[in-house]
């Protein structure tokens, strides 16, 4: 999206509009509804609509547009003077992406990975509640359905701890790579 958003080419503008629209559509569908909407495609892709493998298409289709938007924001927040300087020195598009955009926005990209990972942890818990297994399944079936609040609470605490660990790791990496 970043590469095509400021282009004067009609083709690039169309590509940008289509990709941005798809990102917005898939970001706006609640995950539990996305799982249900993708059941036929999930059956065709992985051969089942139950279990951990069945959760993968929905997890990928929900996470990819989410992270794509975070990447676009990270790239948009860069000092455009740095990009213009690279262009003035004759850098190719590939060189601008690999030598300027990614290195300069790496703290924001890692933060985006952290946020996306934490969102995926929540999504996997939701997927577990409808048969994908894991802590969500445990909390729902053995906790909520069995009226066992202790199991629900324990699964929730474990999920919270996992989120804290990923947030700590992401923050640590960002601090190490941030040049500011």
Where do the protein language model's features map onto the residues?
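Transmembrane alpha-helices
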Residues: 93-123
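Glycine-rich helix-loop "coupling/hinge" segments at transmembrane-helix boundaries
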Residues: 123-159, 178
């Amino acid at each position: 999206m970043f590469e095509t958003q400021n282009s004067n080419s009609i083709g690039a503008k169309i590509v940008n509009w289509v990709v941005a629209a798809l990102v917005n559509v898939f970001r706006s569908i609640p995950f539990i509804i996305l799982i249900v909407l993708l059941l036929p495609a999930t059956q065709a892709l992985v051969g089942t609509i139950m279990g951990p493998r069945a959760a993968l298409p929905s997890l990928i289709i929900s996470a990819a547009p989410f992270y794509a938007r975070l990447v676009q924001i990270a790239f948009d927040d860069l000092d455009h003077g740095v990009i213009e300087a690279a262009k003035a020195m004759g850098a190719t598009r590939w060189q601008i992406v690999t030598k300027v955009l990614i290195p300069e926005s790496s703290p924001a990209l890692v933060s985006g990975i952290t946020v996306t990972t934490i969102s995926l942890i929540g999504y996997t818990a939701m997927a577990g509640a409808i048969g994908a297994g894991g802590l969500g399944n445990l909390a729902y079936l053995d906790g909520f359905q069995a009226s066992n609040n202790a199991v629900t609470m324990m699964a929730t605490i474990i999920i919270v701890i996992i989120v804290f660990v990923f947030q700590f790791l992401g923050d640590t990496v960002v601090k190490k790579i941030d040049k500011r």
